[in-house]
């Protein structure tokens, strides 16, 4: 309304088109009673409109290795009580839940993690994620996807020799298995990131095929990418996944000195609109998990993580691929 009043009609129309797209709602703060009531209110409102809400549970202890999005529960017990309340808020209504962005891809054992080398924290993280899966899946109509990073992060089932302590560093397939993915509906890729959809589909399909070989065929490790690519897709047998396409229309950013490729990179655009009609056998949906226009953190001139940044929102809308209007 303000932009229309200022004569910025085209900008205002772009923002209205952006705002019309369904986006996930994140739950990030303490208080079991509060999260139960807030989740219940969201789910009830979505049901009244005939929609299925997408929720993000983001409260795991030592969240984000105490970086821009630091926070989360203070203990394993607090987290379990919080996720129990989260699930109670959904009940048996329809909902999609993305569980703990970076919760498996970013373990506290990463060598640069600010938490420190406490080996007990890694098994604790897996217990927390497993508890979330089992608790949420008690809901009759809750679909649960474990966040699994993105296509340029973790290898499939081997650690990078220069990337941390080998006993704690597992590839993403092992992390998903230890996190309980076989009891969930699948995994999520690219949450709050910028990787091209094509790259994510290739990576996610390889993960699914390796999970199939590990769980159904008794394989000890993932075969080479070429062998995985040659393996036929078995839609009913392989793990499905969802993609965050909210900001990947222009792909990832090549950072300059002192920059990152993930924190408010300039020149990015909105990606594919949210849909369950993806045309990809193993991809259940393209979702807007990250709300376009919410800052990644205090970088590139942006406000604190999660704060609304209208200038970035407008740039994302202007550079959308496919175009927003």
Segments and roles (model prediction):
Residues 1-89, 291-323:
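N-terminal carbohydrate-binding/catalytic regions of secreted carbohydrate-active enzymes
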Residues 2-14, 154-310:
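Surface-exposed substrate-engagement region within the catalytic domains
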Residues 16-25, 31-33, 141-153, 159-169:
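Solvent-exposed, charged interface segments at domain starts and junctions
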Residues 17-21, 62-64, 108-111, 250-254:
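Generic detector of short, locally flexible boundary/turn motifs and exposed helical patches
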Residues 24-28, 52-57, 94-100, 105, ...:
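Structural recognition of the beta-strand scaffold that forms the well-ordered cores
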Residues 25-32, 67-76, 114-123, 148-154, ...:
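Second-shell loop/turn segments in exported
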Residues 31-34, 66, 73-75, 112, ...:
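Generic low-polarity alpha-helical segments
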Residues 41-144, 158-183:
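Substrate-binding cleft of extracellular glycoside hydrolase catalytic domains
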